[in-house]
Amino acid sequence: MGQTKSKIKSKYASYLSFIKILLKRGGVKVSTKNLIKLFQIIEQFCPWFPEQGTLDLKDWKRIGKELKQAGRKGNIIPLTVWNDWAIIKAALEPFQTEEDSISVSDAPGSCLIDCNENTRKKSQKETESLHCEYVAEPVMAQSTQNVDYNQLQEVIYPETLKLEGKGPELVGPSESKPRGTSPLPAGQVPVTLQPQKQVKENKTQPPVAYQYWPPAELQYRPPPESQYGYPGMPPAPQGREPYPQPPTRRLNPTAPPSRQGSELHEIIDKSRKEGDTEAWQFPVTLEPMPPGEGAQEGEPPTVEARYKSFSIKMLKDMKEGVKQYGPNSPYMRTLLDSIAHGHRLIPYDWEILAKSSLSPSQFLQFKTWWIDGVQEQVRRNRAANPPVNIDADQLLGIGQNWSTISQQALMQNEAIEQVRAICLRAWEKIQDPGSTCPSFNTVRQGSKEPYPDFVARLQDVAQKSIADEKARKVIVELMAYENANPECQSAIKPLKGKVPAGSDVISEYVKACDGIGGAMHKAMLMAQAITGVVLGGQVRTFGGKCYNCGQIGHLKKNCPVLNKQNITIQATTTGREPPDLCPRCKKGKHWASQCRSKFDKNGQPLSGNEQRGQPQAPQQTGAFPIQPFVPQGFQDNNPHCPKCFRE
């Protein structure tokens, strides 16, 4: 890239010097870096461009067309290239005549050499004098009578004209005459714009260099410090300094500063200082009216409210979102909230938005809840101290005073905010077709359902069924513990009623239940079963009551009162304690009748009864006894083997 820039700079050195001096004479400064970038793009997409350069306006128009074609094909053209091309094209327009265009090669050869050598010098006076002597005089004097300064100003300073909202006015009110063949009388034309002979004749007169200077209303003025910005916002940057006063004669007398738009700026400043930043938002806008007859000085101008309807694209997006996701889906709630808080919506806007997006049944629900919310808000307005002068007709956009769009556009900001809150609340209560809103008591957490999902369902149901915000918060905090599964309840129980003031209870519950149901939680539950320790480090104890003494913490078989009673009963019934070890298990001093051991001292299992009687013979049952089967050969008393004994 460095080699390419150096090649471009050496290739178009004289032409670059000429362009820079030409633009500088016109009051525009362009850096060499930007010019090199421009010629790099020109060399890439316009290979026909001559090395010696050209001053033909047709060639520069052709460059613009080819760069546009390259941009349409996907090539990236930097913005600085377009700016520099437009400035050079505008600077060359005054020098075009009906004759053939002038090329840099038409100038004397010494001009090109001197311009190339002297551009490296730091002295600005020497550069300007060389330019005036060799280039500026023969070129600029050739078409002095065809200079259109209005067009040049409009092209070079388009952004400044847009900010002021006014076209170029170089002549004051008293001098607004059509230009003739000569822009100025002969006596007022700078010396450098006269033919070269005049320069030689007037040797005693000091040369006055031409330099275009914008009128006063187009000069840069630093912005004032911000007095109505956001809290803590630093003052606006001052930017660069205003243009210095040029040491040359002005081409035109200074025009009076434009006052167009100043009334609007004063109204905007006043409204912002009063905190009314929403008065200028879409779709209702306020525009200043011209002062009428008899208006006094200092009196604020009247404003006219103008209404602009919603775009078709916005209504289409709302309709598709409601159809695809539902009116109360997170996407639709976010979209509706951004529209409501980003624009100044009047009752007519809410009605159009609901009619175009919702089905007939859903719109009927919206209208019903809207009217219900208006009645509640009117009661609050009347009970306020002092009462708020906003009635039901204004909040609904009906009646003789608020039925038209022009009347609703003049509503106060407080009424706009109340309409917004009521309509958002009514939208949240819309139910999908075929679905019913369950009670918050029936919303319970599943055994494997994550706790945040359960809380989200609970909040959604509570928001639709409970209107009061404080009551809704209390109900959600209560049901978030009562309707949770046992695992989450055990994790939340230590936090119940102990959350510090200022902290969100639901957020603390969600943190406590984080990880429940995962592998880590299952491993901890297994460790609890083995060690008898819960998550909080407390020892697991039996929570029921003993059936013997009624105490909590042990079972009946382990009841100390029952064991003490058994020992007392044995001592009173027998009159003496066991003399020796138990004859049954041989490992305890107790009577054999009270032995409950299942193993003896050697670890052998003990049966229920230690001593059993002799086994009894089987008894015959039935009317006919069963004869045993005796094989043949064994029927005699002395059977003999057929192999060992013979008859």
Curated annotation (Swiss-Prot):
Listed InterPro entries: B_retro_matrix (IPR003322), B_retro_matrix_sf (IPR038124), Gag_p24_C (IPR045345), Primate_lentivir_Gag_pol-like (IPR050195), Retrov_capsid_C (IPR008916), Retrov_capsid_N (IPR008919), Retrovr_matrix (IPR010999), Znf_CCHC (IPR001878)
PTM comment, free text: Myristoylation is essential for retroviral assembly. Alteration of the glycine residue leads to a block in the budding of particles and an accumulation of Gag inside the cell.
Annotated zinc fingers (CCHC-type), start-end: 544-561, 580-597
Topological relation to the membrane, as annotated: Lipid-anchor
Region spans: Disordered: 165-264, 598-641
One Pfam family named in its UniProt record: zf-CCHC_5
Bias kind Pro residues: ranges: 232-247
Any GO BP annotation: viral process
Principal location class: membrane
Feature: compositional bias, Polar residues: 604-622
Keywords: Cell membrane, ERV, Lipoprotein, Membrane, Metal-binding, Myristate, Repeat, Transposable element, Zinc, Zinc-finger
Cellular component annotations (GO), alphabetically ordered: plasma membrane
GO MF terms, alphabetically ordered: nucleic acid binding; structural molecule activity; zinc ion binding
Residues linked to a lipid group, N-myristoyl glycine type: 2
Cell compartment(s), UniProt: Cell membrane
Family: Belongs to the beta type-B retroviral Gag protein family. HERV class-II K(HML-2) gag subfamily.
Domain notes: HERV-K Gag polyprotein contains regions homologous to the matrix (MA), capsid (CA) and nucleocapsid (NC) proteins from infectious retroviruses. Evidence suggests that HERV-K(HML-2) Gag polyprotein can be cleaved into mature MA, CA and NC under certain circumstances. However, the exact boundaries as well as the size of processed Gag proteins have not been precisely determined yet.
Remaining remarks: Insertional polymorphism. Provirus present in 16% of tested individuals.
Function description: The products of the Gag polyproteins of infectious retroviruses perform highly complex orchestrated tasks during the assembly, budding, maturation, and infection stages of the viral replication cycle. During viral assembly, the proteins form membrane associations and self-associations that ultimately result in budding of an immature virion from the infected cell. Gag precursors also function during viral assembly to selectively bind and package two plus strands of genomic RNA. Endogenous Gag proteins may have kept, lost or modified their original function during evolution.
Protein name (database record): Endogenous retrovirus group K member 8 Gag polyprotein
Native organism: Homo sapiens (Human)
Taxonomic classification: Eukaryota, Metazoa, Chordata, Craniata, Vertebrata
